[in-house]
C-alpha cells in the first residue's frame, strides 16, 4: 500500500498545495512502482481525499501519469487511516512523514493495532521527497530499514 499525496504525488508549486488536481509525480515514482509491479507486487494506493470528486481526481492523476496498480482506497465517513490499513493488512505500507501537517500522529501506521502492525513492513519517507531512495527489488524492499 502506497500513500499518494506527499509520498508519490506533490503539488506542482507551493501555491497549489491544497489543489490536488495540480499534483504531479515526485521524481521517479512511476518508474519505481512500475518495477515493483513488474516483479509481481500487488500495488494499491491510499489517498487523503474523502470526497468522491477529489478521489476521482487522484484516480485520474494516477492513470494519467501511468502509475500501475490494482486499487485506490480512501476514507469514507467516520473512517480513519488505521481502519483501512487494518482492513486491508498490506504486507508493506509506504507513506511520508506528514511533516507539514503535524508529523507521526497523522500517519496511517501510527494507530494501527499492535498485533496487525507487527505484520506490516512500515516504510516512511520524507514528505514530498519521493520514493527514489527505496530499492527497485521487492526482496530488498521488504528488508528495507528506515
Please name every model-derived segment.
Residues 54-146:
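C-terminal cap/substrate-recognition subdomain and adjoining C-terminal extension
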Amino acid at each position: 500500500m502506497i500513500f499518494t499525496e506527499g509520498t508519490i504525488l506533490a503539488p506542482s508549486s507551493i501555491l497549489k498545495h491544497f489543489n490536488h488536481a495540480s499534483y504531479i509525480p515526485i521524481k521517479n515514482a512511476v518508474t519505481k512502482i512500475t518495477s515493483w509491479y513488474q516483479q509481481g507486487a500487488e500495488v494499491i494506493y491510499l489517498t487523503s481525499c474523502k470526497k468522491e470528486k477529489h478521489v476521482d481526481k487522484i484516480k485520474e492523476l494516477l492513470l494519467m501519469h501511468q502509475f500501475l496498480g490494482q486499487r485506490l482506497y480512501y476514507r469514507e465517513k467516520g473512517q480513519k487511516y488505521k481502519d483501512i490499513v487494518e482492513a486491508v493488512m498490506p504486507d508493506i505500507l509506504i507513506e511520508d512523514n506528514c511533516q507539514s501537517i503535524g508529523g507521526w500522529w497523522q500517519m496511517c501506521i501510527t494507530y494501527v493495532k499492535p498485533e496487525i502492525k507487527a505484520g506490516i513492513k512500515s516504510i516512511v519517507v520524507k514528505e514530498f521527497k519521493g520514493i527514489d531512495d527505496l530499492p527497485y527489488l521487492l526482496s530488498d524492499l521488504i528488508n528495507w530499514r528506515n
